[in-house]
Amino acid sequence: MSGLSIRQRLALELHRQLIKDAQHNHPLHQLFWESTLRCNMKCRHCGSDCKVSSVHPDMPFEDFRKVLVRIKEKYDSHKIMVIVSGGEPLMRDDLFKCGRAIYDLEFPWGMVSNGRLMSQRNIDRLLASGLHSLTISLDGFEEDHNWMRGTEDGFGYAAGAVEIMAKEPGIKFDVVTCVNNRNYESLEQFKEYLISLGLKKWRLFTVFPVGRAAQDPDLQLSNERFRGLMEFIKKTRKEGRINASYGCEGFLGEYEGEVRDNLYTCQAGLSVASVLIDGSISACGSIRSDYHQGNIYKDDFIDVWENRFQPYRDRSWMKKDLCGDCKWFRYCQGNGMHLRDDDGNLILCHYERLK
């Protein structure tokens, strides 16, 4: 990898101070609610263990509502985005009531959906419930998407929802695509397809090697293809026809400032928190290792947010092994928390992949 430019280094130094401020002040900006583990798909890479939905039934909304009321007592609710996740949130019959209640508490709210139940009627009901943002997963053309999602008809529903939402004013809307070895070669054609649907914002992810995804070679890009993905995003951004960006994870060296709207930082525990299906208080919903900081059924959320989360806000414990003598640790801070196992070991380094 070639070195970073002077412009990039200056930007990273300025950004480093912003990260320090966030570690100290930890302003809550985004709260995920894992509302259900039920799902209507069988995704190859799924991070939520939807097979245990019978063990962990849907969280009663009133339990989560109490958390929101407590947060509203302390912070400005207008500045905190509530993201309803799953599973598939639309599996909840009361989702629209939940959304409206969140809206009535003056929190903006959004959701992440696989699109399977995103009919025009349900979209209208979501909008009437005060929906502020929506993300739909679309992992390539029909054959590739359905393969990834473990369904025979998922593509049509998701693509239809994208076409509807792309025309909806006033909603923050984007599509996320998990790039893998099946859809990699068709990214250029898929980009043109998304543009034809009217999409303005497209996030591309790679699947991190945890759980079943770690053992599936179709899901893990080679280092060469990973760099190719960075070049594709960089080129697409320069074209200016669709706002493409790489997912939030990973310090990307020479690609910092080139493939995302912002420079890398893991906001887990700094500005992002989550309430999981069992009441656990955590940070980013992608974190599957045990870095929970409390539980809403026995702890006060505000007390947990303001006085715990030390492993997230002081990353010095990560400066070991591969990160021990890395000159980029001052900017990377040990990569995302979701890329640490239960013992604190690093699972994946994006910078190493780009060397």
Language-model features and meaning:
Residues 35-42, 270, 323-325, 329-330:
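Cysteine-centered iron-sulfur cluster-binding motifs in ferredoxin-type domains/subunits
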Residues 10-27, 286-355:
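Flexible mid-to-C-terminal extensions adjoining Fe-S/redox cofactors in radical SAM and related proteins
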Residues 50, 86, 138, 206, ...:
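Residues that line or immediately flank small-molecule/substrate-binding pockets and catalytic motifs
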Residues 25, 74-76, 128, 170, ...:
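Alpha-helix termination/capping residues and helix-transition junctions
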Residues 27, 37, 266-267, 320:
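Residue-level preference for beta-strand/loop junctions
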Residues 2-133, 221:
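Conserved alpha-helical substructure of the radical SAM core
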Residues 54-55, 128-129, 133, 137-139, ...:
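Radical SAM enzyme [4Fe-4S]-AdoMet core and its adjacent flexible, acidic
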